[in-house]
Amino acid sequence: ATGWSAFFIDGKWTEAKK
């Protein structure tokens, strides 16, 4: 989605504001 990214890293769900 525009303005943010959500991704699964090392077994953890991470939300990175961009």
Swiss-Prot record:
Top-level lineage group: Bacteria
GO biological process: DNA topological change
Catalytic function, reaction form: ATP-independent breakage of single-stranded DNA, followed by passage and rejoining
One of the record's GO molecular function terms: DNA topoisomerase type I (single strand cut, ATP-independent) activity
Listed Pfam families: Zn_Ribbon_Topo
InterPro entries named in the record: TopoI_Znr_bac
Alphabetically ordered keywords of this record: DNA-binding, Isomerase, Topoisomerase
Entry EC no(s): 5.6.2.1
Family: Belongs to the type IA topoisomerase family.
General function of this protein: Releases the supercoiling and torsional tension of DNA, which is introduced during the DNA replication and transcription, by transiently cleaving and rejoining one strand of the DNA duplex. Introduces a single-strand break via transesterification at a target site in duplex DNA. The scissile phosphodiester is attacked by the catalytic tyrosine of the enzyme, resulting in the formation of a DNA-(5'-phosphotyrosyl)-enzyme intermediate and the expulsion of a 3'-OH DNA strand. The free DNA strand then undergoes passage around the unbroken strand, thus removing DNA supercoils.
Subunit (UniProt): Monomer.
Protein name, UniProt field: DNA topoisomerase 1
Source species: Klebsiella aerogenes
